[in-house]
Amino acid sequence: MINVNDLKSGVTFQLEGAIYVVLEASHSKQGRGQANVKVKVKDLRTGSTTIRSFTGGEKVERAMIEKTNMDFLYNSGEAIVLMDQETFEQIEIPLNHVEWELNFLKEGQKVMVRKFQEEVLDIELPANVTLKVVSAPDAVKGNTAQAAQKKVTLETDFVVETPLFIKEGEEILVSTETGKYVGRA
């Protein structure tokens, strides 16, 4: 059991039959009242994100998540196909479990697969990934108050805003958490 005061980003726990991973956690205490803990969590089975509130001192059951390194092979249209790097076993994960992650996946990429008691839940990507720019319109510098940005399309068909100097064919770093441009690769 984990005390909710110990919940922080990355911790996994079970509650009401669901398995959650903490994305953000904030603690607040008002006057003489009891402390409250608000956590933004992702349900690893459905992929949905919600905010849960707990009163200080509550306990939740820890979920023991097994992580396995795998290679992304291809998208079959209904699921993504991954292969274990050691046993060469192939598994499929339905697309609705990895909608956001699909924006950053390219063939041969290494990912971490999260499993709970042999049930495949979802995949975990590195914080930043390197992707190639396939379409970058020429931007015209205008009268801008802040840094000018333009929309470019990446090799995964994901569209991201970048500075004007990014050109077609360049490789850039993109955050997998926010989907924003981080820098040149």
From Swiss-Prot:
Q: What pathway does this protein act in?
A: Protein biosynthesis; polypeptide chain elongation
Cellular compartments annotated: Cytoplasm
Has keyword Cytoplasm?
Answer: yes
Any single GO BP term:
peptide biosynthetic process
State any GO CC term. cytoplasm
Task: Assign the protein's first listed, main location to one coarse class.
Answer: cytoplasm
Name this protein carries in UniProt:
Elongation factor P
Source organism of this protein record: Metamycoplasma arthritidis (strain 158L3-1)
